[in-house]
A protein has these predicted regions:
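Compositional signal for N-terminal targeting/processing segments
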Residues: 2-280
Length: 280
């Protein structure tokens, strides 16, 4: 399996810290876990299933054009949804992809590589952020992909300067994806949907726009969550936008790629209390 390319993280700050309350994990659905043992169990228990995703012919052609012209296809998600890794799996299979870029801390690369080579998942502080970008389902799907054949995995979230703007952070993420690109390899790049727009937004210049300026023809698939729940530091609900009886489909809407997920469910997310930094 190819080795990840990752940049070294800067040394941690020596500022004093104080404890914060433990995250509350619901007793019934247990959407977050606070121990490595519990996370191991959640990964092992995750049921990998084939999604019944209908890909309309025009959308299929548009996504393939993006991959053919730019070697990239973006997927904009809301973190903390159980179905997200299954959608990643479905899209990679549909387009024959073996390269995946995730908005995960790049310092996790050795931990994830070791896990994908068959070793137990090692503990690491960056696993426990709790925003939902890392879930039990992701680890289960990655393990399946790695077992099936070569998997090129890029983790592109890294250290930022204290004075960096939102746009500068996104520019750095785009640069990491491009630096890790292997000629001839086509990659699905997944991030929170604030970062995947290929044009400027009210937040600034997102990662997707930076990539599109360097890779003409790049397209974004944006997931629309029709309702249901997700985990982002705590249980949250989507506003109802699509009826639960609607079809899961990838289609073109006003020239843009859209993916409807009628009902979302909470992912199992690793989360531990993060120390709050005090001013020096």
């Amino acid at each position: 399996m190819p080795e990840n390319r990752s940049l070294a993280l800067a040394a941690a700050s020596s500022q004093q810290t104080r404890p914060v309350p433990q995250p509350v994990c619901q007793a019934v659905s247990v959407p977050c876990v606070t121990s490595l043992e519990a996370f191991h169990r959640a990964v092992a228990d995750f049921a990998i299933t084939d999604l019944d995703l209908m890909i309309e012919p025009e959308a299929l052609a548009a996504a393939r054009r993006s991959l053919d012209s730019s070697s990239l296809l973006l997927l904009g998600e809301m973190h903390g949804v159980r179905e997200n890794p299954l959608l990643i799996r479905t899209l990679m299979q549909a387009f024959g992809l073996t390269s995946l870029a995730l908005e995960w801390p790049e310092d996790l690369a050795p931990v994830i590589q070791a896990f994908l080579s068959g070793q137990p998942l090692a503990d690491h502080p960056w696993l426990w952020g709790g925003d939902g970008r890392i879930t039990a389902g992701h680890l289960a799907v990655l393990a399946e992909c790695a077992a099936a054949g070569p998997l090129e995995l890029v983790l592109f979230n890294g250290v930022i300067g204290a004075d960096w703007s939102w746009s500068q952070r996104d520019e750095a993420m785009a640069s990491r994806i491009l630096a890790a690109s292997v000629p001839g390899t086509r990659t699905l790049a997944v991030a929170g949907n604030a970062h995947t727009s290929t044009s400027h937004t009210e937040l600034g210049v997102p990662m997707g726009a930076r990539l599109a300026s360097r890779r003409p023809g790049l397209q974004e698939i944006r997931i629309t969550y029709g309702g249901g729940s997700f985990w982002n530091f705590e249980p949250r609900q989507f506003a109802s936008r699509i009826g639960p009886e609607a079809m899961m489909r990838l289609y073109l809407h006003d020239g843009a790629l859209a993916l409807d997920l009628p009902v979302a469910t909470e992912a199992v997310v690793p989360q531990r209390p993060q120390p709050m930094r005090e001013s020096p």
